[in-house]
Amino acid sequence: MECAVIGAGVSGLTCALRLLEKGHLVTIYSNKFSPNTVSDVAAAIWYPFLSYPIKKTNRWSLETYSELYKISLNSPESGVTIRKGREFLRDKISPPDWTKGINGFRILEKNELVNDYIFGWEFEAPVIQMNLYMPWINDKLIKMGCRFNEVNLEYFSEINEDIIINCVGLGARELCNDIEVKPIRGQVIYIQQDPGIGRFDQQPETLTYTIPRNDVTVLGGTAQINDWSMEIRDEDTEDILNKCESLWPELDRNNIIGFSVGLRPSRYEVRLEKEYFLDKLIIHNYGHGGSGVTLSWGCADEVMKILESN
């Protein structure tokens, strides 16, 4: 069947790849392609964050975890590696359910905690170097015959294909008239210094992370709802550095080499469902919040299940 995918971020590319693997003809429609999508500036580590409903996103996240783990073993050129990470908390809580399905999970000993953190855990997680991962997926799509159409769509009726996979992200505000879609602004810092392991405080109000990739370490972050600014803010930079130094006292500010800003496509819950419109089957797949990469393969497989059942 001829299928259209709207959106060329990681969600759209992953859905396109799954469609091609099943023998469908695929065209991706987008007004932005890599390296100009928000996915290209993702930190990016596998970690469920700012995405709902929890039960579904946990399942999609673990399915993605498994796929990324296999990619790290079989395709090192993809930029996916497995690193240890540590989550630090100021309160003792029950670990999330997803921790039961990942490798290397353990509760930290008291002597492994830093500063005034009182609880935490260690785990193994895929770290994705997006400036390698996005071209890697794109190359696979090209080799499989995917077509690309750079266009600014206003209406679904502009698409000829009868099957549409809608991965438009923030663009759903206009294309779908979905006012529940809101940006969550994220600013990060790039530094040439390796902390050895990833360190996180993923509570939304104190969002802090140091993510060691093969090329740089990414420091973050911010989670500013309904903030559309793409400017680098000095006050955010200072706040990020102060927070990261509490997790990583050895951080050396002299090693900073750059900054970036992206707008996460947030929604009260991921919209992954079918809709019929003008005799077209539309499968919506957007609103992944801060977990676009983390949910990508699980959501793509869910899209395929919906398509195959129709």
Name each model feature, range by range:
Residues 1-9:
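Beta1/beta-strand and adjacent pyrophosphate-binding region of the FAD-binding site
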Residues 12-13:
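N-terminal Rossmann-fold NAD(P) dinucleotide-binding loop
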Residues 21-40:
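Glycine-rich FAD pyrophosphate-binding loop
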Residues 43-63:
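N-terminal glycine-rich dinucleotide-binding loop that anchors FAD/FMN and/or NAD(P) in oxidoreductases
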Residues 63-144, 267, 274:
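Flavin (FAD/FMN) cofactor-binding and adjacent substrate-gating region
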Residues 70-71, 181, 196-197, 214-218, ...:
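Flavin-binding catalytic cores
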Residues 124-206, 215, 225-228, 235-243:
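Predominantly flavin-linked oxidoreductase catalytic cores and closely associated redox partners
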Residues 136, 254-310:
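C-terminal catalytic lobe of FAD-dependent flavoproteins
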